[in-house]
Amino acid sequence: MRTPITNVNWLEHHEIMDELLYHEASLTTHPMDDGFEAEVLKINLDQESYVLKTWSKSSKPDVQFQYRLLDVLSERGVAVSKPVGWGINPDGNKVLLTSFDGTPIHKVNNKTMKELASILARIHQIDIAELEHIQLPKYDFIDYFFPEVREHTDLNQAVISLVEQTPMRQDRIIHGDFHLGNIVEEQQRFTVIDWTNGQLGDPRYDFAWSFILLKIHISERYADMFRSAYLLDNFMEQEELEVFEAWACLRWILLNRRGSTPKGPNVSKRVKSILGSNRFLKDLDFQGFK
């Protein structure tokens, strides 16, 4: 029986790939929920499971970089999936095979928030000198996280105002989209997945994005627990916190206007509350969000 891994031109892989190909007749596959960017398939062999991501949609990230990044992070004990291999399938789409590390988090508590904050803090503490051989990408902050913002006059004016008040750093590895949807759990062990946005960036923004998403979509109480736990490991001044929370809120509004944010009860109310309490945003007039 031929499987989705059979006809792939595997450009880099670990030894376990040879075993999977040797036992391909025994492999079973099960579809998983696709993300915005890729098709996702679970592959099983005996008691072991793996995840195959195929970038068949419009997004075409650097999969080789993801593979190598996961390799060095997993070697250092960071809570990421172990990469098995990456390559190109017969349709010309890039694929990545990794370990299967659990299912999405459905319930959170104080302990969960503290552990996730500790994981993110540890990622931000990695010495990038150890990762030089994988050439971490560095992008223009506005172009990357605020694409097409110039088409929104109100947001663009706010961005221009914040740029003047934010000495931006790009000296740490960041995940770029650290939230509950990109974390899985198995037997109380958390794993950070989807490193499409991994890059050299400002850890203060990376943290603020996670914090704002928790505040908007989960609860202020759990968001504050996450913040307190993170700041124990990576201290930030109050003004830094506020300015990067402003950046994160502006990005949320931009994504919301593009239809890329989850809907839920009280979401608009929470966003308005954040805008009203942030000194960098409270006097600005926004045209609304869905």
Where are these regions (language model features)?
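Active-site acidic catalytic loop and adjacent metal/ATP-binding pocket
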Residues: 39-44, 51, 160-205
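Conserved hydrophobic "DFG−1" position in protein kinase catalytic cores
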Residues: 42-43, 54, 85, 99-100, ...
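A conserved alpha-helical element in kinase catalytic cores
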Residues: 49-96, 104-125
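Short, polar/flexible loop-turn hinges at active-site or ligand-entry regions and domain interfaces
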Residues: 103-110, 130-131, 217
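ATP/Mg2+ or Mg2+-diphosphate-binding catalytic cores
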Residues: 254-290
